[in-house]
Amino acid sequence: MAPAPVTSAGPDQGTSDDVALHRALFVAILRAAYSGELAAALAYRGHWRSLWRAHRSDVRAEIRRIEAEEWHHRREVGKVLAEMGSGPQRWREVAMWSVGRFFGSLCFVGGWFGPIYAAGRLEGANVGQYEQAAVHARRAGLDHYLPGLALMTATEDRHERWFGNLIAQHPLLPLTSRLLGWRPPPPLDETDPEGGLSDRRPDDLDGAGATADPAEEQRPDPSR
């Protein structure tokens, strides 16, 4: 992605103050998303590692691929933040690292429904986050970021639907949805052998397990 230009108000923009506000909101959302992707990736790593039984090998493989895409999104968001002259918030990095490790560990001791429901709910929140980022990018004149945001939104949407498909008929879903609010969206096309993810997966992730910068997996130093 190209460095963020200094823009003047265009047809979809307001005053210069409005543009500055939308740029600030765009950055704020992406800072939250950057750390949120860390929590998601670490939680998914614990999740797929907990699925050691042979009859869950297909689910295990897909969650492993989804983890890889979360790391990819984190790298892409990090690039945008750098181009905007910003970066991650250390306190949020520490918090989300802890959240990801905690929920990843819970997958080894809890049942099957809970982690899948939580993953779908998380992916739904990610969809909304990237959609809102796109709104602010457009209003701030940062249209060159829209294609990347659209791709990440579509990928997160596919993740949400894939997780939702797994629990759509589970007897606990109606009660859980009433209590926690998230209900799976309509299912993906079941004729797609890869659950609808293949046409959105970056080429460098095809056929690969989850890959992350080793530095990203280490607990962030809150003093830095």
Describe every region a protein language model picked out.
Residues 1-224:
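Non-heme di-metal
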